[in-house]
Regions:
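Long terminal accessory segments
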Residues: 133, 137, 146-148, 152
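A broad, low-specificity signal marking well-ordered, structured residues that form hydrophobic/aromatic
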Residues: 3-4, 26, 99-100, 135-138
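Short, charged beta-turn/beta-strand-edge "cap" motif at the junction between a beta-strand
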Residues: 53-60
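Aromatic- and Lys/Arg-enriched surface recognition patch
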Residues: 64-135
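Hydrophobic beta-strand signal
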Residues: 51-52, 67
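Compositionally biased, charged N-terminal/linker segments
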Residues: 1-46, 144-145, 152
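Hydrophobic/aromatic beta-strand segments within beta-rich folds
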Residues: 46-51, 100-102
Length: 152
């Protein structure tokens, strides 16, 4: 099993939106970065665990735990001219972007803020806490996962 962190802006699609979905499950669409796409397409597997992270908000931090319930498949929002994620270079025959389906397992007991995560030497190699990392999808080691659950 692999571990991940996926960022979202709560004003666009946050934990409350996912919790309100049927079966607390939805597709994770709109990722438009090749490195993040490759992780979703090639590395995310059924059962992988994912931290849900709220970004671009008053208190950025980890707010929930999700599970990958469908492996990577073409992101249909790229083909929709009305979608904010439309990409005219992506087609059903030659998809450029991929998504996975995730299910909300549970909210974390509290928001675990980025400011707190940055204080722990155990997390210094985590991409989230390194300067300049803007990826919306990133790997988390098993040790980092367990440590974060321990401070929850």
């Amino acid at each position: 099993m692999n571990y991940w962190l996926m960022k979202t802006e709560p004003s666009v699609y946050g934990i409350d939106h996912l919790a309100a979905e049927p079966n607390r499950t939805d597709h994770w669409d709109g990722v438009r970065n090749y490195q993040a796409r490759n992780m979703m397409r090639d590395q995310m597997k059924l059962g992988d665990q994912v931290f849900l992270y709220h970004s671009n908000c008053k208190e950025p931090g980890i707010v929930g735990i999700m599970e990958v319930v469908r492996e990577g498949y073409p992101d249909h929002t790229a083909w929709d001219p009305e979608s904010r994620y439309h990409d005219p270079k992506s087609t059903p025959d030659n998809p450029r972007w991929f998504m996975v389906d995730v299910k909300l397992v549970r909210p974390t007991r509290r928001t675990i803020p980025l400011t707190e995560l940055k204080r722990f030497p155990e997390l210094e190699d985590m991409p989230l806490v390194r300067k300049g990392n803007r990826l919306s999808v990133m790997p988390v080691t098993a040790e980092q996962w367990d440590f974060i659950l321990g401070i929850e």
